[in-house]
C-alpha cells in the first residue's frame, strides 16, 4: 500500500501526459485523420486501463505472490552498495540464499534457477547504478559543461532537419507496378495492341521470368457497364492503355525495376509516352484518384492554357527527382464532327437531340442511355440487353452516313447523310473541369528523392509563371503535395499544442511553474534523438514519424515526472536536504523505473522499426522515431533534468500541505515502492 500510494499521483499525471499528447490527432483533417485516430484512441484507452490495473490488480498480486520478498524490497546486493549520500547499505544475504536452496522439487529447482538469474541481474544492475551515480555527481558539479553540451547537441540536430527530406507517407513495395502507355493520338486499336506487345517484351527483358506472376494489359477505353466517371483507369482513347505487372513474393525491390524501365522504355520507344501510376490502394487514396502525387493545374478558359501547361512541363522535367512529367489532356485527337441541318431535320420531324441519341446508341450501345433488361423465367435472372451497330459495319465514313435515324413520331427511318454533313478535325480527347473552369493537369512522379524537396522546386517554377498568365488563368498545386502540407501543418501545430497542454497539466498538479519547466527539459533530447535516428536510418520526415515524435514526447515527459516528483518528496522528507542531494537521490532511486519504461517501449517498437512483413515500410518511421526519441530522452531525463533541477531549485523548498500530510501518514519515503 505504501508503494502504491507513493507513486499514485505521479503515475496518474504521467498517464495523463501520454494521453494528452494524442488529443491534437482528433483535430486533424483528411487522410491522416482516418489513419491515426484509431491509433490515438487505442493508446489512450490502453494507458487508462493499464493505470487502473496498476492501482488495483498489481498491489493485490504483490500482496499474495511476493509475500517472502516484502522484507527485502529495499535491499540491494550482499555486502552493501555505495548510496548516493555516501553511506553503506547492508543486507542479510543468508535468508535469500537459504530460500533459493530450500526447494528440491522440479518447480522449486526452476524457481531457484530463475532466482539465481535475478540475483546476477541485480548484481550487474547495481554496478551500473553505482557508475551512473558517479557520472550524475560529475554532471551536477559541472553544470556549465552539461548545458554547453546540451546546447551544442540541439543546434547540431536542428542543422540536420533540412537533410531529412519530407514525404507524406513512406513508399511501400506493393509487389506490383502499373505502367500507362500512350501511343500517338489517332493510333488504331490494332496498332496500339502491337505496340503493347513490344512494350511487354521489353518488360520481360528487365524483370526475370521467375519473378513475374502475371502481366495484364488493358488497351483502350473500358467496356464495362459501369460509367467511366467511376473507373480508376486513366485511359482516354484507343491509343493508350495500362499494363499491370504482379511480381512473385520473393522479388527484388519493385522501385529498382521501375527505375530501369523508365530509362529503357523512353530510349526504345521515343514516339510513345510512359508513366507509372499508383498500383496499390493506399497510394491511390493518398493521391485522391490522381495518377501522380504532384498535380499542377492550369485553370481558365483562355486557349493558351495548354501551351502554358507544356511550358511548365518542360521546366518541371528538368528538376532532379521529377519523373514521368506529362500533360494529362490531349488536344489533337482526330474526330468526326457531325453538323446537323436543323431546317431539314425540322421538316421531317427530327431534332438535333434525336440525331445525337441515335449515334450514341449506334456507336456506344444503349447500355448507358436506355438500359433494358430481359428476365429469364427459368432461373429468375435479369440480363441486360443492349443495342449497338457492329464495328465492321461502320468502318468507313460512308457507312457512318448510312446510319438510320429514328424518332417516336417519325413514320420511317432517315439516313444520317440526308440530315447532316460529316467533316474530319482535331479536338481534345479528354476535357476536365475544376469548379466549372476548364483545367489542364501537369502530372509528375518522384524518384530517388523526397516528395517535399521536389515539391518545393516545383512551387518555384509555378511562382515564376504566375506573373505571365493571361487574365482569368490560375495555377495551383494539388494531389498528395497539398495533403502533405496540410497534414504537416496540423501535426506540427498539434505537437506544439500537446507540449503546451502537458505543461499546463503539470502546472495544475505541481502548483508551480518551475517544476513543469524542469520536466519538459527532457523534450529537447527527445526531439534530438528523433532527428538523429531519422537521419542515420535514411528515413524522411513524414506523417508516421511525426506520430512517433508525439508518442516519444509523452513517454519522455512521464519519465521526467517521476524524477522531479521524487526529488521534491526527498526535500519534503528531509528538510535540510539541498537541491544537489535531492537530484542525486532522485536519479539513484528512479534509475530502474525510468530505464524499464523506456526499454519496454523501445523493445516493443523494435519489430515495427525494421519494417518487416507486408506493408511494414509504412509504419517503420513511427517505430524509428519512438526508439530514437526515447534513447536520447532517457539519457536527458537521467542526467540533464537533475542538473536543471539542482540549478532552479536552489532556494528553500516549501512542501505542499497534502504532500506533507501524506508523508507523515506513511512514515516517509520508501525506496522499494519507488522501484
Mark where each language-model region is:
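Extracytoplasmic/periplasmic
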Residues: 96, 163-246, 258-263, 302-335, ...
